[in-house]
């Protein structure tokens, strides 16, 4: 019974994260619209509120294309794996109701975020394009350099919280 409740809680958390990301992109589009002295997305529904759902439907119904010389399986699996990793990181966040409580949550967070580097590298490599590979390697180098500073800041916060 406890497993089913934690599974339902995890699915509810993932759905809430996806919906909040959709509405944050709507907020971003609205703010950018007002910066450019226009209203932003307002054609769908009341004040454009159903716009993220319409965008999701449009993205899921678009024709799937892939480069002719690409490695088909890794070309499609790497972005999906990246999405699952970014959603999996939310499981260790402490909320009012702890879904998964364990002592090494910070280390789990750093491990999951560092696995995202491999998805970018595989996505760049699997397209069999030199430009995509170079872009992927640049993104990997940038992500690794950001992870080092994130880990140092996190460890400093942990160190000073015990003093």
UniProtKB/Swiss-Prot annotation:
Q: Which residues cross the membrane?
A: 3-23, 77-97, 104-124, 143-163
Topology of the protein relative to the lipid bilayer: Multi-pass membrane protein
Is Nuclease set as a keyword in this record?
no
Would you tell me the Gene Ontology cellular component terms? mitochondrial inner membrane
**EC number(s) in its UniProt entry?**
7.1.1.2
Record InterPro entries: NADH_UbQ_OxRdtase_su1/FPO, NADH_UbQ_OxRdtase_su1_CS
Q: Which UniProt keywords apply?
A: Electron transport, Membrane, Mitochondrion, Mitochondrion inner membrane, NAD, Respiratory chain, Translocase, Transmembrane, Transmembrane helix, Transport, Ubiquinone
Q: Which locations, inside or outside the cell, does it occupy? A: Mitochondrion inner membrane
Give the signal sequence positions: none
Keyword check for NAD = yes
Question: What GO biological process, any one, is recorded here?
Answer: aerobic respiration
What is the top-level taxon of the source organism?
Eukaryota
Q: What is its main location?
A: mitochondrion
Per UniProt, the enzyme's principal EC class comes to translocase
A Pfam family found in this protein is NADHdh
Catalytic activities: a ubiquinone + NADH + 5 H(+)(in) = a ubiquinol + NAD(+) + 4 H(+)(out)
Q: Single GO molecular-function term?
A: NADH dehydrogenase (ubiquinone) activity
Q: Which family does it belong to?
A: Belongs to the complex I subunit 1 family.
What's this chain's function?
Core subunit of the mitochondrial membrane respiratory chain NADH dehydrogenase (Complex I) that is believed to belong to the minimal assembly required for catalysis. Complex I functions in the transfer of electrons from NADH to the respiratory chain. The immediate electron acceptor for the enzyme is believed to be ubiquinone.
Q: What is this protein called?
A: NADH-ubiquinone oxidoreductase chain 1
């Amino acid at each position: 019974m406890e497993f089913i409740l934690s599974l339902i809680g995890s699915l509810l958390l993932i759905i809430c994260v996806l919906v909040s990301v959709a509405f944050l992109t709507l907020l971003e589009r609205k703010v950018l619209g007002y910066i450019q002295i226009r209203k932003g997305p307002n054609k769908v529904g009341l004040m454009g509120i159903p716009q993220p759902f319409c965008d999701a439907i449009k993205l899921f119904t678009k024709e799937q294309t892939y480069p002719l010389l690409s490695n088909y399986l890794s070309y499609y699996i790497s972005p999906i794996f990246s999405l699952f990793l970014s959603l999996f990181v939310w499981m260790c966040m402490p909320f009012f109701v702890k879904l998964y409580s364990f002592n090494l949550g910070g280390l789990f967070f750093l491990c999951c975020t560092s696995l995202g580097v491999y998805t970018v590298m595989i996505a760049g490599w699997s397209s069999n394009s030199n430009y995509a590979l170079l872009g992927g390697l640049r993104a990997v180098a940038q992500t690794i350099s950001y992870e080092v500073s994130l880990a140092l800041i996190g460890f400093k916060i942990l160190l000073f919280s015990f003093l």
